[in-house]
């Protein structure tokens, strides 16, 4: 299963990331990658984030991995939308593909190519829900952790003696 994310569309739609982009787009991109990395870990899906670089003179398409995520920058003259459409075309026959974008035109195109769509708001809501589930799960695991139990502090011989005493009752 794949989630393809229209990077700048999501950054511009999420107010928490928009604040970062005012300082630097690089910082906003890093924060998006960080958020989606934990989301990917919980969901167990392959996430590809696509960023526009079509205005970069002489720019070639760049692909690299950032932890479990794949990051793609479009080449000069090619929009992120075009890269997303190409990926959907390549992947949709053999896998479930969902595209995260609030671009209405892009949603129509990817739906026509056999992919699902999720808006920026829907992705944000799911991300918040996943973060809460991770937090609750972590809290529960901390509550169940019992360091320094008696069994961990005594020798094997002492455990045998105590077990024998317990059985005599």
Where are these regions (language model features)?
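Nuclease catalytic cores that cleave nucleic-acid phosphodiester bonds
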Residues: 1-3, 9-169
């Amino acid at each position: 299963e794949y989630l393809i994310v229209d990077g700048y569309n999501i950054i511009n739609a999420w107010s928490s990331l928009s604040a970062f982009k005012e300082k630097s787009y690089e910082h906003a991109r890093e924060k998006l990658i960080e958020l989606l990395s934990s989301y990917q870990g919980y969901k167990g899906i392959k996430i590809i984030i696509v960023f526009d670089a079509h205005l970069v003179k002489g720019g070639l398409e760049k692909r690299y991995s950032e932890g479990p995520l794949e990051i793609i920058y479009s080449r000069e003259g090619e929009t992120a939308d075009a890269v997303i459409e190409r990926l959907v075309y390549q992947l949709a026959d053999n896998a479930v593909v969902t595209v995260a974008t609030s671009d209405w035109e892009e949603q129509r195109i990817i739906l026509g190519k056999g992919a699902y769509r999720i808006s920026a708001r829907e992705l944000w809501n799911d991300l918040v829900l996943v973060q809460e589930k991770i937090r609750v799960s972590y809290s529960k695991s901390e509550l169940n952790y019992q360091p320094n139990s008696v069994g961990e502090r005594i020798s094997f011989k002492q455990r045998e003696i105590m077990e024998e005493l317990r059985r005599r009752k």
